[in-house]
Amino acid sequence: MSFEAVNLYEKSYKNFEHWRSEFCGEVEQQTKDEPSLLMGYSMGGRLAMDACVNRPDLWSGVITVGAHPGLISHDERDKQLKKDLEWSRRFRTEDIHELLKEWDRLPVFCGRSNCSSREITELDSEKISHFFDVFSKARQGNLSSLLKNHTLSPLLYISGCDDLKYTKIGQDLAASCRQIRHEIIPNAGHRVPWENQDAFISEVSVFIDSVLNK
């Protein structure tokens, strides 16, 4: 099996639809009839969900980590868009070192320090600013109902035990659809792949084996 990491920095996407068309088109060309698995964390997990429900024919399995399926009410969307556009503005205009310190203190990270490797020099403030705008949860479709009716590829939803918000999302999704399995990783918050690597890799490996050997 070969693996390929998607670099969102390589292109400038206009919206979810543009990203989906480009990404799924490339996957379709490259994989032909070979089994394809898709994995994404946080924002990448939201993009993975979008590709999963809109092009279910492409995937043998999907793994999402700490990903939101979408907002329901207009009020939620308005509030989220206001927040994301403010972050977008700040990443365009403020010092990225100080901004990232503030970002790491957000409640979603469960009070845990960032243990992932991060090279500040490799980060592009303009691109990050753009992502906050075009990939805002406010601009994402509400995928919950589509995921509940998902009947093709199995989906593994992973959350950390300390990440109560996303654990509840995973539980609700798994309860609503037999194709969705939810696994809670111990000793981890939102940044599961870095906070408990061994347990994360173990769950992902079991899922991949089950998909490829069914």
Which residues make up each language-model segment?
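Catalytic histidine-centered segment of alpha/beta-hydrolase-like enzymes
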Residues: A188-I201
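Gly/Ala-rich beta-loop-alpha elbow adjacent to hydrolase catalytic centers
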Residues: G40-G44, A48
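Conserved serine/cysteine hydrolase catalytic core
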Residues: S125-D172
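Catalytic histidine neighborhood in serine/cysteine hydrolases
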Residues: A175-R191
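Helix-loop "lid/cap" segments that line or gate small-molecule binding pockets
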Residues: L85-F91, E102-S113, F131-A138
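Active-site loop/oxyanion-hole signature of alpha/beta-hydrolase fold enzymes
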Residues: S2-M39, S202
